Amino acid sequence: MGMKKNRPRRGSLAFSPRKRAKKLVPKIRSWPADKKVGLQAFPVYKAGTTHALLVENNPKSPNNGQEVFSPVTVLETPEITVAGIRAYGKTTKGLKALTEVWAKQQDKELGRKLTVTKKEEIKTVESLDAVLEKTVDLRVIVHTNPKTTGIPKKKPEVVEIRVGGSSVAEKLAYAKDILGKTLSINDVFETGEFIDTLAVTKGKGFQGPVKRWGVKIQFGKHQRKGVGRQTGSIGPWRPKRVMWTVPLAGQMGFHQRTEYNKRILKLGSEGAEITPKGGFLNYGAVKNGYVVVKGTVQGPAKRLVVLRGAVRPAEDKFGLPEVTYISKESKQGN
C-alpha cells in the first residue's frame, strides 16, 4: 500500500519517553474511592498463564449457556506483613508525611531491604493520635515474604498501601489493629471482584523502529542499500535538530503499566490445586495461596504485581461466570 495524503502517525506518544522503569516495584499514583474499611491493594507474584473453560452467561451471546475458552493468569499470593503505619497531611504542594510508626517486632529478612532508625523505633501509636486532626490520609507499609515461595530470594519488596474507610479515625483504628500482623489476600479481595493490575512489563532491550513504533518497512532501493528497516525521514532541515516525536530505535519494554478491570475468577489456599504438571515455566510450583485472574497480566514469571481495587469499576451486567475447568496440563511442551 502506497503513501496516503493523510494517515495516523506510527506508534503512540502517550507513554513517552519510552525508557526503563526506575524500580521493579510499581508506584501507585491513585486509589479507589472506597468507603469499605481495609487495605486497597495487595502485592503478589506472577506464576504463569494457563486456560480455563467458562460458562457464557450473556443472554445475548450466541454461545449463551455454553462453555467458552478463556486465557487466565495464576498469581501466587504469599501472606504480607504489616511493618508500619504512615500518616499524611495536606499541604499546598500535595500530601506530606506527618509521622510514621513501626512495629516493635520485625521480620529479620526486612533488614535486607531497609533499616529502621532508633529515632523511628521509639515512636508509639500514640504519636499517630497526636496528629489525628491534621491527618487526611493513612497508609500502611507492608512487605512481602518471597522466602515462602519458589522464588530463589529472601529479600522482600516493600509497598505502601492506602487504608480505605469513611473517616480517618476509622482507618487509624484498623491500622493499629493489623500493625505487626500478617494478612492474606482473602482479607483484601474476594472472588468475582474487579481489580487493576500494576507491574513492570517484560523487557525487550534495544529494538529498531519497526518493532518499537510499527513504521513501514521500505522496499526497492532502500532494501538494496540496507536501510529498509530505518525511518524514511527523521525531519526537515530546519529546525536543525531531531524532534522527540520522530520514531527511532531505543529501549522497548520494562515499562510500568496499569491494566484496568481484571476479574478474579478464583481464590485458593492450596497451590497444588492449580500447579500444572512439571510446574509453571521459569517459576515452578505454587506453594502458597493463589488467585486466578481472567485474561493476561503484564510482566514475566516471578515479577511482582500489585493488585489494586478498581478505580473505575466496570458495570457487572451478568455476574461471575461459572468456571468448569482450569487446565493443569504440562507447560513444558511435552
Curated annotation (Swiss-Prot):
InterPro entries (UniProt xref): L3_arc_euk, Ribosomal_L3_dom_3_arc_sf, Ribosomal_uL3, Ribosomal_uL3_arc, Ribosomal_uL3_CS, Transl_B-barrel_sf
GO molecular function: rRNA binding; structural constituent of ribosome
Keywords: Ribonucleoprotein, Ribosomal protein, RNA-binding, rRNA-binding
Biased composition (Basic residues): 1-10
Methyltransferase listed as a keyword: no
Any GO BP: translation
Pfam families, alphabetized: Ribosomal_L3
Ranges for region Disordered: 1-21
Superkingdom of source: Archaea
CC per GO annotation: cytosolic large ribosomal subunit
Keyword rRNA-binding belongs to the record: yes
UniProt record similarity statement: Belongs to the universal ribosomal protein uL3 family.
Entries under NCBIfam families matching the protein: L3_arch, PRK04231.1
Subunit details: Part of the 50S ribosomal subunit. Forms a cluster with proteins L14 and L24e.
Task performed by this protein: One of the primary rRNA binding proteins, it binds directly near the 3'-end of the 23S rRNA, where it nucleates assembly of the 50S subunit.
Protein name: Large ribosomal subunit protein uL3
Organism name: Methanococcus vannielii (strain ATCC 35089 / DSM 1224 / JCM 13029 / OCM 148 / SB)
Lineage: Archaea, Methanobacteriati, Methanobacteriota, Methanomada group, Methanococci
